[in-house]
Amino acid sequence: MNHNKLKKWILMLWGTLFLVSCIEQDTTDELYQIFSDAHQYQLDTNPISATYAGNHKLNDRMPSVSTEQIEKNLKFWKSIYYRLDKIQLNDLSKNDRVNHKIFSRIINSRIRGIEYKDYCMPFNADSGFHTGLSRLYKAMPFKTVEDYKDYIARLLDFPRYFDEQIANMRIGINNGISVPKVVLKGYEVTIKTHVVDSYEESAFYEPFRSFPNSFNAEQKLEIKKMGQQAVMNGAVKAYASFLNFFLNEYYPNARTTLGASELPGGMDYYNFKIDHFTTLNLSVQEIHEIGLKEVARIRREMEVVIESVEFKGSFSEFLNFLRTDPQFYATSPEALLKEASFIAKRMDAKLPALFNRLPRLPYGVAPVPDDLAPKYTGGRYVGPAEGSKEPGYYWVNTYKLDVRPLYNLEALTLHEGVPGHHLQNSIASELNDLPEFRKDLYLSAFGEGWGLYSEYLGIEAGFYTDPYSNFGRLTYEMWRACRLVVDTGIHAMGWSRQQVIDYLSENTALPIHECTTETDRYIAWPGQALSYKIGELKIKELRKFSEQELGRKFDVRDFHDTVLGSGSVPLDVLEDQIQDWVAAQKN
């Protein structure tokens, strides 16, 4: 009897466990179906994203950004969020709970952005929907006649796409939603560069300058002729229309206020941007105070460097010396690029001491394209399209060499190249155990926090031995600390543009030109500037915690591998992962 009862109990237990296992598997399957449905929708509705993702089925068109399509998008993303909300988290593995949390954040942010009508401002102070299109062809194949015809059809679709963007900007103007007028002076250069008199002058004509050997003379001639017409009647026509709209309608009617809190969404909108770019629950006042404390700390370190070079004069006089003395500036674009390349190569040799895992993808050093350079930052990392044979690129701005100081170059190069964005993004792309949406995910607080932390790693790697270069590192760190002060100042405290320029110029050795372009960037891109320092402080805090907890067991290579080993994550998720790693190391 007891034996039968035991047998019955075991069968019931087995059945219960089997049922639980089935429920858990069903829940996991549903979660990954949500990921798949969202990914497919993104590919189907955004042909540019599809092209960069290596999916070339829609290479013959541009996206739709019509109000009808935006409404469809909002409805779809809300349905995805509803499905995510129904998932029973207890039925998921720990890793999939993290995946659920990250994806829910992404979708919620996407919904809120549409509801706040972010699509009515499709550009900021240095880039926008129109600025990268001339390089889109690099992500497209040109092996067959159909490949070329796809590109031709895409060029001819530019006017429709630009008209829809213009219609959205008109909606914005009528609702008080626009990029502030004060940052738009001279912005037309980013548009005008593509309004040319001949297809030969257009960057969009580049794919028609050469053809595969398999093409016969007749095919080449026909495609060239079609391409010439498509460039002029498609791309150039669209940019000319946008230029006319910008100069005669958008700029004259752009808002004269600065802060995000002055937009219809008010402080709620700025708080949304804070959450989006920091991934932490921080108030405006908390961020502002963190910034002020960091500014004071870094200023003390700067004063020590000034004393070490025995400079006779005030802090502002030292900054003026750095901004004006020719010894600190390259004499040619080639010289600046060579110096950046040399720094990058030096850092390559230091990586094995800091990381166990290194990416396979190489990267190059190149100038910022001419059409972007005048309003662009000092440098930026640009990754390759998925499936392309291109490397990553560290872009260095060679426009106006007298505002591109060499003393900042070590910090800039480590931030944008390695161990910064190139290493971080390339490792993420090679993580095979992550869902697809996380492989190319870029959360600003994590990414830019890592970039700034990478500048700090230069100290451990033997950089900044020259006191002026060390001051350059400090001025870059000070710059990011100032961002916490000025971003909150602009968007919540009523700071003026000149107030921000003055604050940057008084506290950093950035050239006045860069102080101005950076100020315009912060005005036009609320919240983004907060991500650097907030992210870096969190990574440093977690490293200090790990060192204290592990003592002699701490290995910086393992720590860095753990930070980068899950791709881009919200900072609270990163904290959980580091705490788990520390606990595992202890055991």
Over which residues does each language-model region extend?
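Bacterial N-terminal signal peptides
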Residues: 11-20
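N-terminal hydrophobic targeting signals that begin at the initiator methionine
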Residues: 1-2, 23
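General helical structural elements
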Residues: 9-12, 139
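Bacterial N-terminal signal peptides that target proteins for export
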Residues: 2-10
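N-terminal maturation segment of proteins
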Residues: 22-587
